[in-house]
Amino acid sequence: MKIGIVGLGRVGSSTAFALLMKGFAREMVLIDVDKKRAEGDALDLIHGTPFTRRANIYAGDYADLKGSDVVIVAAGVPQKPGETRLQLLGRNARVMKEIARNVSKYAPDSIVIVVTNPVDVLTYFFLKESGMDPRKVFGSGTVLDTARLRTLIAQHCGFSPRSVHVYVIGEHGDSEVPVWSGAMIGGIPLQNMCQICQKCDSKILENFAEKTKRAAYEIIERKGATHYAIALAVADIVESIFFDEKRVLTLSVYLEDYLGVKDLCISVPVTLGKHGVERILELNLNEEELEAFRKSASILKNAINEITAEENKHQNTSG
């Protein structure tokens, strides 16, 4: 598998390392506006290949993306402490459009994973600018949020996170929606499990949801960025593609019409295989969850409309 990574900040470089450790990249091209940084990362990773499977890793340009199976987009300005993901939009939208034009030119048949925040909006801009197949362009979405929530529940209830099944959908950010109505531990509905163990109540579950939502902010406040967990999440996504696992993951995908949400990239459960997104799964949400999901979609739609209006204004002024 040939993998291209655009953007070698902490997320991009950590993702390259995670992919090297997974061992399924025979070729990895690293692209960054700072070519020396990309070259440094490539050398550092190459020196680790005696301890992993052999891989050809090098710094390159967009033209080197030709023949890539997967392209990971992690380029963008970093999130500031206290800054929401949506506030990042204006600073990253133009960067994303430029990347989209180059990726579609040199690797039009690749599967593209957008990681840059705010991921839902930027995935939408990438898709629209590139004109690529919507099944092959998606964002990392709420994969990490889902993992965070499962971890919190597992730690509290004393189970492995792998035995906890719950999804976080909607925006990867402040308006994300935990789907409590479908939450299970080992096949037992979470509400029933809570009654058995008598450890959980609605306030505790609400606290889990809030901790999940605030996790990135807390990490950024302490160390400046989140990068290890998201790198592992992206490597996990690529693994599902490589092995054609058809796993169900909450990715930010383009929706034509999903529970009343149209023309938007937002996180919902999908099956992912070697050809990209194969199925979009429609959840049976309760009224409260459905309302929250549509509200989340509305927030993202408004953000897209605002930046589109700004872009049109800028073009008219410059023209």
From Swiss-Prot:
Q: Which GO terms describe its molecular function?
A: L-lactate dehydrogenase activity
InterPro entries the UniProt entry points to: L-lactate/malate_DH, L-lactate_DH, L-lactate_DH_AS, Lactate/malate_DH_C, Lactate/malate_DH_N, Lactate_DH/Glyco_Ohase_4_C, NAD(P)-bd_dom_sf
Pathway connected to this protein: Fermentation; pyruvate fermentation to lactate; (S)-lactate from pyruvate: step 1/1
Sequence positions that bind NAD(+): 10-11, 32, 37, 62, 76-77, 115-117, 140
Where are the active-site residues found? Answer: 172
Pfam families to which the protein is assigned, alphabetical: Ldh_1_C, Ldh_1_N
Describe the temperature profile of activity.
Answer: Long-term stability up to 80 degrees Celsius. Fructose 1,6-bisphosphate (FBP) increases the thermal stability at 90 degrees Celsius (pH 6.0).
- Activation and inhibition: Allosterically activated by fructose 1,6-bisphosphate (FBP). Inactivated by Mn(2+), Co(2+), Cd(2+) and Zn(2+).
What is annotated about its quaternary structure and interactions? Homotetramer.
Instruction: Please state what the protein is called.
Output: L-lactate dehydrogenase
Q: Give the originating organism.
A: Thermotoga maritima (strain ATCC 43589 / DSM 3109 / JCM 10099 / NBRC 100826 / MSB8)
